[in-house]
Amino acid sequence: MRNTLSTFLSLVLCVLSASGQQLAKLPRLSGPVQLDGPSNEPAWQTIPSLSLTMFSPTYRGSPTESTEIRIAYDDDFIYASGRFYDSEPSGIRATSLVRDMNSPSDDIFCLVVDSFDDNENALGFTTSALGNRGDFTVYGDAEPRDGPPFNESWNTFWDVAVVRTDQGWFAEMRIPFSSLRFQDDNGRVGMGIIAWRYHPRKNEIVISPDIPPNWVWGFMKPSRAQDYVLDGVFSRNPLYITPYVLSGAGHSSELNGDSTAYLRSSNSPREAGLDIKYGLTSNLTLDLSLNTDFAQVEADDQQVNLTRFSLFFPEKRLFFQERSSLFNVTMGGPNQLFYSRQIGLSEEGPVRLFG
């Protein structure tokens, strides 16, 4: 019995030791850095670059271009820097400055952060050689169901700077901890992180950590992220207030009573409202909306429907974006358990909320 117990305890210690080896301490910056792209400050020089592996087109093949990616943090931000060298800098591709408009033909730098370290959900941040920003959420461990497992309508607050030279292009990201949701244990935080570079001319993806291409979206998969420990970081309760004011002018002309002249009238409609977002805890966010103006939301893509079935349009209203992945439950096939765009609607049209 004693030998059996000793063997069991040895196995437990081996498992704990093996799991502990998977954790890495994310390096902390030793000084200030300027968000300008090159990442040549002394504080960056002490941060080791990540070990990168070719993800595609040949798993663990030899990359054709040199890449250096570094990730670090301080009390308020997570930083990521990338040096993307290119032997033909004139061939670097970037097509748009519009947010969330990264093209498959663009050179891309991406950071995926599983801030809760739950191996299920993550936040993605991308930039191109032009310095545009793309942000999205990943849900369902990046396993496709009825489409890509992303919500590209999600936006948050963060910054990026990019510079191009005759050696390639260089980028720096700065993501506030207030834009991330996470739980801390007396200032100790665990997060999963994936970083990769996409080189479109050669269809190459180099990635950290080493992830095999066994899944369609393996380079976005939270359960395959490298687990990091951050010390001295505490969850934040940010308050965001977004007011809006709308005004217009209208003119009309109507015949008078005896139809001898036109009476001109004018009106100036005005409308105001605001949205408030407050993080009560790391798991609970309060969203308030006063006189919501959903007309200011990005318009849906036009589609032609020649069937008797309704079209599916993605949710783009920020009010419904917070942790929306919790409701992404499918029922098999094209059916979806919860679809926020149908709130207040029936087959006959809008539903009266009062009166």
Describe the function of each predicted region.
Residues 1-4:
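Positively charged n-region of N-terminal signal peptides that target proteins for export
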